Structures are given as C-alpha cells and as structure tokens.
Amino acid sequence: MIHELKISHRDIELIQAELEANKPYEACGVLIGTIDGSTAHVEKALPVTNVKRTRTSFELDPNEHYNAWNDAGKNGKDVVGIYHTHPVSSAVPSLWDRETMENEPSVWLIAGADGMRAYVWENGVKVVKLIEI
C-alpha cells in the first residue's frame, strides 16, 4: 500500500491552477511517475478533460486517460494516481469518490477549497502522507 506521495511544488501549483481555471466545475487528471516501496513519486501531473463537467463529480476522458497510461509505459513510468478538485468543498473524498476508489486502486489526490490531501483505498479510505518536494 502507498503511504507517501511525493510531488513537486510545480505540480501542486498546476493542480491549484486547474482548480481555479475550472471553477465552479471539478477538474481532473493523472499523476505520472514511479512507485518505490510504499512511496509514489509524481514526476508529472497531467490534466485530463472532465467529460462530466459538473460541480460534484468527474470522469476522466477515456481516450486521454488511455493515452496517458500508454505514454507513461513507453517512458518506463506508471500512472501512480489520479487527481481531481473540489472547488467549493473540502479535500475529503465524497460518497461518490469513496465508492469509486474501491475499484480504482491508486492514489487519489484531491485539491479542495481548504488545501490538498491524498488517499488510497485499503478496506476503507486511508490518508496518504503528502510530501512537497
């Protein structure tokens, strides 16, 4: 299980900019990098179109999501997680997030009106330590 998520200040700023640019709707994307033991290292946050374009949910564009997985693999990387925003609420998983996390075994980074937090699903939602590098 992932216990730590290391992400650059640059990628944190990119996700925050996505939150602001897409308000009041949720924005989303993928986190590309590597996993070393229980630490996921984000090398790139890649915005992906939210095909739902709503205030309370997101759905990654399937073609862009596939291309991100494909491109990451070609470069010896993985999609280590996904991110999405809660532009008018806190950075905690919603009921929909929790139900979806159970079937999406990766890190979920949520940027909310009150900051940014990371989570994984392991017999329930678990907090992942977010480390800015």
Residue ranges and their predicted role:
Residues 1-79, 87-133:
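Conserved beta-strand-loop surface patch within small alpha/beta domains used
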